[in-house]
């Protein structure tokens, strides 16, 4: 009986040891699999979202493409959203998860910082380009205009419609309104219902480019993007309207957001702006 008992104990012991070994192997395999998943996620490039003013819809994708190529990133690693600066700011205020905000003015980024002064924001606004204002028509020759003849054209009684971006939301619209006010024609045009207000500079250009209106105060970059003929636009002197200095701000701690911003401000990034009809920041 003693021998039988010992054999039974030995069998039970072997069975228990085998079960423990199998359990340990299973746990080890499970932990290894988890580690592989964690490492895979960690090695994936982070993705960022950029909220950009509508006037950047032509040049910014070019800059992103060049940056992605230089850094071997996929197209989807940087997501772009275009709208009026004011609309984007409202989205950010409401909690939209953007990593970088590129405004068409300096006001909104500065406002974002001032509203968080007590929390001491880690980043400060940076000026990334200066926009230019252009008087454009898809149907009428305006290339030979100058300051005097443009003022005369605007003041002359006419049924011609002129579009500007919403001055309250779009910096290009605010500068266009200021220009019209210095020429003493804004109130008259508004009263005559000849001013057609667009939501943003992108829509203003659409109105002018499709012939829905006769003229439009648009971004020089938009005119450059479509390769407009010299007869189709007149670039306003930069001293004739409030400077359109465009500021941005990094909103998150994402390393990719900081690195892309550095590229935006680099000579390579600034060359894209210059080629697109902006004034590069030196």
Show the residue positions of the predicted features.
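Bacterial N-terminal signal peptides that target proteins for export
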Residues: 2-13
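Short linear segments in intrinsically disordered or otherwise low-structure-confidence regions
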Residues: 18-20
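C-terminal motif of bacterial Sec signal peptides marking the signal peptidase cleavage site
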Residues: 22-26
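Exported/periplasmic ABC-transporter solute-binding proteins
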Residues: 27-73, 81, 86, 93, ...
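Central helical "cap/lid" subdomain
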Residues: 116-126
């Amino acid at each position: 009986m003693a021998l039988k008992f010992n054999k039974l104990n030995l069998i039970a012991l072997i069975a228990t040891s085998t079960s423990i070994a199998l359990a340990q192997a299973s746990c080890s395999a499970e932990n290894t699999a988890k580690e592989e998943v964690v490492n895979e996620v960690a090695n994936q490039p982070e993705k960022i979202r950029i909220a950009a003013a509508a006037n950047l819809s032509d040049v910014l994708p070019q800059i992103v493409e060049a940056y992605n190529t230089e850094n071997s990133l996929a197209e989807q690693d940087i997501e772009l959203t275009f709208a009026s600066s004011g609309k984007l700011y409202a989205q950010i205020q409401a909690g939209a998860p953007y990593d970088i905000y590129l405004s068409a003015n300096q006001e909104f980024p500065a406002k974002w910082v001032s509203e968080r002064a007590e929390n001491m924001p880690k980043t400060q606004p940076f000026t990334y380009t200066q926009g230019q204002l252009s008087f454009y028509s898809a149907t009428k020759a305006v290339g030979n205009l100058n300051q005097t003849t443009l003022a005369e054209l605007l003041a002359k009684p006419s049924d011609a419609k002129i579009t500007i971006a919403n001055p309250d939301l779009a910096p290009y619209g605010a500068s266009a309104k200021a220009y019209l006010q210095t020429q003493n024609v804004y109130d008259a045009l508004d009263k005559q219902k000849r001013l057609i207000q667009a939501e943003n500079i992108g829509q203003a250009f659409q109105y002018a480019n499709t012939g829905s209106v006769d003229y439009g105060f648009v971004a020089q970059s938009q005119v450059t993007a479509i390769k407009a003929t010299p007869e189709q636009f007149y670039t306003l002197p930069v001293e004739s309207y409030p400077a359109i200095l465009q500021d941005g701000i990094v909103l998150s701690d994402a390393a990719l957001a900081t690195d892309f911003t550095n590229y935006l401000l680099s000579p390579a990034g600034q060359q894209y702006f210059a080629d697109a009809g902006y004034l590069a920041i030196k």
